[in-house]
Amino acid sequence: MSSLASQLAQIAANSRSTLNTKVLKAAHSKSLIFEPRVAATQTYPEIYSICLEGFEELCNLDSRFTKFTQSLWSPQSQEADRTQMSAAENAALDKHVEAFLHLCGSRLRLMPTIKAIEWLIRRFRVHEFNTAALIATFLPYHTIPAFVTLLSILPANIPKEYRFLDPYIRSLTAPPRAAIVQQATNRPELLTAISQYTLDSCKYQMEYPGLISFWGGVMVEATNGLLDKYRSGRRSIQIENDNALMQQLGPVLSDAMVMKSSPGLQIASYMVVTILAAKGGLADNALTAFMDQLVHGWTPETMRPGLVTLCIISQHRSAKQLSARVTKALLKVPEVASVMNEIGKDHRVDKLANGLALALVDRLHKKGDVRSLPVVNSLLLGNVLREKQIKVVYKSLLVAAHRINDQVDQDGAIRKELGTVLVSLSQAGGEVGDIVRATIDEVDFDIDALELTLGASIRPKLAVEDAPEAAAEDNNTPKVDKEAQVAQNFEKLSKLKPQTASCFAEEPLDLLEELYSLFLSVAANESNLQKFDEAPVLSRPQAPTKLFYASFYMRLWCGSLPTLAKVAALDRVKNLLKDEEFATLDFQAVVPYAIVALSDPAKKVRRAAAELVTVLGSFYETKPSKARRVWGSEGLYAKNAAVNWLDFDATKSLIHSVLIPSLEESILHEDHILAALTNALESSKSKDGDKKHLSHSTRFAIFKFLSSHVVGTPLIAVKLRLLQSLNQIKSISGTSRTDLLLSLLQWWARLSEAEAQQLLAREAVDEASVNNAFVDVVIANNEAGLRLIFELIRDSNVITRNGLVQSLFSRVQKIWSSMKAETQFSTARALLTLSQAVHPTSSEPDVIATEATDVLHKVELTTDILLDFLESLYDDIKKATEKPATKRRRVGSSEKSVDSQSPADVSASLSKATFVLELVQESEPAKHPELLPSLFTTLSELQHLRTVVGSELGYLQSLVLSSLLAMMPAYKDSKELTIDPAAGHGDILASCIQRSSSPTVINAALLLVASLARTAPDVVLHSVMPIFTFMGSSVLKQADDYSAHVVNQTVKEVIPPLIETFRKSRRNLVASTAELLTSFVVAYEHIPSHRKQDLFITLIENLGPEDFLFAVLAMFVDKYGATDNMLAFTTQIIGSFSVEIQLQTLIKHLDLISDIFKPKPVLSAALLAKVDSNSEQDVVKLATKQLTLLPKLLVNRRLRHEISGLAEKDDMESVKIRELYAQLLEGVLTLAGTVKPKKDTLYTRCAEALSNLLNLLSIAEFIKSVEALLDRPNVILRQKVLRALERRVDSESINNPKSREALLAFLPQLTAVIRESDDMNYKHTAVNCVDKIAEKYGKKDLDAVAAAAATIAGDSCLGQPSQELRVMALLCLASLVDVLQDAIVPVLPIAIPKALGCLEESIKAEKPDGALHNAAYAFMAALAQHIPYMISGAYLDRLLVCSNASAAAGLNEECRDSRTDCLQFVAKLIEGKVLFTALEKNWANAASSGYLALEEYLHVLGTALDKHPKSSIAKNTTLFTGIFLNAFDLRRSGVLSSTQELEKIELLINETSLKMIYKLNDAAFRPMFSHLMEWSTTGLPKSDLAGKAQRQVSTYGFLQHFFENLKSIVTSYASYIIDSAVKILSAPLTSDDVLKTLRSRVLRTLTKCFEHDQDGFWQAPAHFNAVAPVLVAQFGHAAGADNCTNDLVLAVVELAAAADSKEHHKEINSALLKHLRSEQAAVRLAVIKCEQELTARLGEEWLQSLPEMLPFISELQDDDDEVVERENRRWIVGIEETLGESLDNMLQ
């Protein structure tokens, strides 16, 4: 049974359907928009109509929402109930809901979206049925308020992955991002849920940037956290953790990286993968899988970030080749190598590039993919690989070259391409080339054989092609094997005819090419090579006489063939020379070619060449007796080639002294042999000693020998290699290399472009190197060579060879510096002519002119050359601007006259002018100052040329001006250089500036003016003003930095001499420059904002800030008004100058303002706007602007900062600044006095300026600064200074020790002023200063303050008749009491009487003086507060009397407050006995002074009673007795005529008396109480009944208050009043009001006694019987006019309650009932009311006597008086209510 119950409970808990109406209502109230109470009342149609609006808006925003119109948003959806749907229907609905939520995700911040989701929540309860999807949709927006609202409506059980939200659901706060990241790190299910939601959104193309950013951020941080979490020190555990991590993240990242429709998701996944790779320490297989997946999914949009990710992954992967998939993908990237190079600027790409290169090389040799070679080449050359990687890749290329076979590369194309790449890499420059060459040296397989293989891969096939038809053979023909092919080659070789002629004389190119190919095919095999060597065509047996054999091999090793082939060729010749039959020959013809071989790039070639040279050396060890025949002396070269052969000695020297000693180094370094040869030919002295030097003749012979071979050999490579050495030799024995080699240049230049290119291509040499080497044969100052150069330049055939032309001009440029001056001059003229040559037939730019121009730009031109150019330029410009002569104009029959040169001539002139002026500018004009006159002339002529051309010619003018400007320093530094002032240069510049519209020209001209003003001011000063006027409207407006520089320079250089000129003229300096200042000020609004401040600071600095700063600031404010911007700007300006300058400026500014108010202003009229001096309104307006500026200038930061440092200095500078400060202060004070009558605004500005001025200096420095002012005879000024000091003291910090010391030190001076001055106002100000100083700092120097107090209290101050002075003195003394306290005691015997006298005087005066009155009280209050013992005896009596008089005088509220404040201090602080004695004495005076005096008296007494201790009160009971007896006798004394005032005073007396009673014990107070009762009854004569009654009224008023407040504790004191009360009540009634009041107070007093009796006091028969009969008897008087019926009834009721016994009740009741038979209705009525109250109060207790009452009640029912009868009925009702039964039966 229990199991079934638990199952049912579980089902109920998980069920979403219920019949509980409260639960249903609560579920219906869940809403994103509405409050629960509102939502609970809404119907589904209402909700649908509201939410449908949001859905429709979403449909307008995104048409994808419309597909939900027929499902979630159909009208029928209003009736949907998920609890009634089947599982299949709910599943289908879930799909719609989740799709809709995905689509809403991007617009959750929009209200229409919230409305739409509201419908899903209200109708479909998605927060319960689709909780996970709803939370996932909102989670990226976890910071917005809507998310918190969502949390508030979620069900109690949310999906497990989102349980971390529970605390936030409870607190209804948004979860921070850090919490989500932490949970994603520690809860895999949360990270999976977020990832799956994101992937689904991307899959449906419903993602948005916010979602991707959220997922990416969480994923990255969670991945980082997981990596930290899974990190372990044990390898096995780490592997397990890595596997677990990959299982968790791998599938998500894999899906994300291939989501091509979502680039953002892909990039975000790349970030995560990057974290994993960088921090995860993953295995290579995992990283490779990531790389494969990445490239599988990337798109053009994500390719670049993907590449970056690949780079990062690769850096954490082993250095091995990439997978096939990654390699293929990278090959598809356009320009992948350049892209990697670019990425490499920010990331390391070397491992990725290395892996790619290795993979591509692998594809190359396995699949023959030749497309990869350019990529590998680019990667190797692209600076993306490191040294080791470059070596590995290059080695892999070499290995691939070995491995490639005919199966992969059938036609040899791949090997050809690979060979080209390998060779190009080996010849590359820079670091990569060095690494590759080092790699070649390091490899352990035969590079030469490889090279030969690669080179032979094509050529053998070419060799066997018998005829063109062979190419057309069927492709299916079986391939001939290599051996058969070699045999065919040899068969072909055997059929060739023998050759004898030198290969250098005749060039059978076809034969040579064929022989080369055959040689290459056999070079690797020695036997085949031997067969080749023995071929008839080579004619080896005739080698001693025939030249073909040796020249063939010599030509071969000088060509661009593989290394192995070159070595084989060298070996053939070496072996040849070893034969004895050659011993009689002179083989010096081989030497030049051996030198070429020794400089070959390949070390093996150089080694073979060295062996050859060694063999050659053996021929020249001993001189033969007979001259040997020189091999090749006939027919080695062409017939017209003459070779200068060496004799034996020269040959021996060349070989044994130059070549053989250099062989070892030559083998190591390819350049060594040429350098050794150059060194040997350059000098006869050798570094090694005299024994090895070459003689002059030998060097000359070798020089000619080698030169002749260079000219004779047909091989360009040989010429080029030998020229590397020969071009280093200028001349030997007067014969220059130009003389020997010029024919070489002539030959090369005669070749057409096609012929030259054919030669270059055949030998694979660089054209530029050849051109440069051939042109370099021309040396400087060789007329023939230079003449040939210019002839060639002008040759129409040479013009087509651009490279040669460039080399010719480059040679001219190279040898320029070595030319003589005359040669340079002539060459420069020729170049200028060429540069200006025009070829109208050429459509392209003239190469000759361009090159000539380039040379002239690059060479250093002398002054003479430049002068010549300028003169030629001047002539051309002059011709262009002059009109033709009259005769020429009249030629022809036409009437039309030619007024100018043709446009072509003008254009040529302009072109030449431009070029020449550019040359001048580039030639560092400062080095050619002699050009200045010519340049000014040119500038002048350009002004005329402008008119002819109709153009600005800005560029030309700028060139001239910049050149002139560059010369200025030279003129300034050299006294020998002068500028003629009469030449009119200044006018030329002024004209140039005014007529030009080019900012560049204007700027340059202004800079030149500035420089001239500094260098030769007389040249330009007379032209300055027009220039500045023009500047204001043009240059100042420019925003560029250069214009700013120009203006600054102009200002710096021109203005100082201009100002100096004005000074010499003895005119008003500032007024004289008003026009200049105005031009700058007016231009202010046009000047770019960033330049304004610097410009005007520069202007002011050069004008002289001490004279002009104030003027500029004033003009600014005058022109533009005192706006915030202008005030800020002027403040910045003044803040840029020193303190001294600023203070001088402010003083002058004050003078300027003062000048405004003069009847005939002078300075202000010159600088400021013109106003009518008679119009006060205009003058005030003008002055207001300036006075608004003044305070702002005083608060600039620099002024405040620097002036604050004065205290640390005491030098002349600080003294000067203090003087200026004092002068400025005086000026401000004086100006304030001037403007005060004018207008309040002006005075306010002055006050503000004064405040800012006072705050500038520290108080110590301020005092130092104003000391001189205080010595002035002008008392008004002195007073103003002290007032300024007073204001300054207010602002000082109390904690500033320096301020304290300074002010206290100043006190004696103030005291002297008070003592000695006759001016009351001055004294007043001094006292005020003392007051403020003492208040802040007085406690630190009591002696000084005490001295000041004595002076103030004396006759010179407080004793003066001046009311204001006395007030100030009293207030000051009050402050000093606080400061000095006991130290002021010696002063008080003088001060107190004077103060009290002032107080009495202030009250007695016809018109009371409130200020004096309050000041006196302030002083007395200070005394009472701080030294109360000094107020005693007569002083206190006098003070109290004065206070009474003050109260009676009816002064204002302020006076009353000051008086009461003082009396409060008196009451609290003066010793008790003294105070109470004085109060007792003062009662009569207070009483006679009226109500207010009495009230204050009683307040003082009450306060004293509160503040003094019980002991003090107890000791003075006698005094208190006297005081209170006097008080209780107040009514009798009759001093108060107003009953209301009397009652208030009596109430106050009673309250005050209680304060005393509270502090007394019973023993002390009971005698006082007894004495009081005795005094009230017997204290007056018996005859004074009225007085006695009045005294008793007061007494019983007190007694009532006494018993009412003290209650039961004083009940026993009632025994003292019983007799008196009975006597008063028993007295016969009279009509006296006093007695009526007395009877009433007696009854009330007894009532309070009865009411608070808790001890049975009134139960005692003695007490009860004494009072009860008398009280009841009072009912008999109820009919009288003075009855106190109400008081009587209350008294009787309280007595009955207090008596609390049947006997007493019966006695009272019996007595009362007797009065019911009274004849008087009033008596009966009073008794009935009493009975009513007793019945109500005592209830059944009282009704115990009901039987006795019934007869009387019955009788009263028929009473004659209706009121009595009615009250009787009420009494009956009261009884019935008490008893709970009717009295009718009893009354019957």
UniProtKB/Swiss-Prot annotation:
Belongs to the HEATR1/UTP10 family. SUPFAM superfamilies: ARM repeat (SSF48371). Component of the ribosomal small subunit (SSU) processome. Residues 884-905 are annotated as: Disordered. One of its GO terms (molecular function) is snoRNA binding. It comes from Neurospora crassa (strain ATCC 24698 / 74-OR23-1A / CBS 708.71 / DSM 1257 / FGSC 987). Involved in nucleolar processing of pre-18S ribosomal RNA. Involved in ribosome biosynthesis. It holds the Pfam family U3snoRNP10. GO terms for cellular component: 90S preribosome; small-subunit processome; t-UTP complex. This is U3 small nucleolar RNA-associated protein 10. One of its GO terms (biological process) is maturation of SSU-rRNA from tricistronic rRNA transcript (SSU-rRNA, 5.8S rRNA, LSU-rRNA). Keywords: Nucleus, Repeat, Ribonucleoprotein, Ribosome biogenesis, rRNA processing. It is found in: Nucleus, Nucleolus. HEAT repeats lie at residues 585-622, 926-962, 1049-1086, 1257-1294, 1301-1339, 1703-1740, 1744-1781.
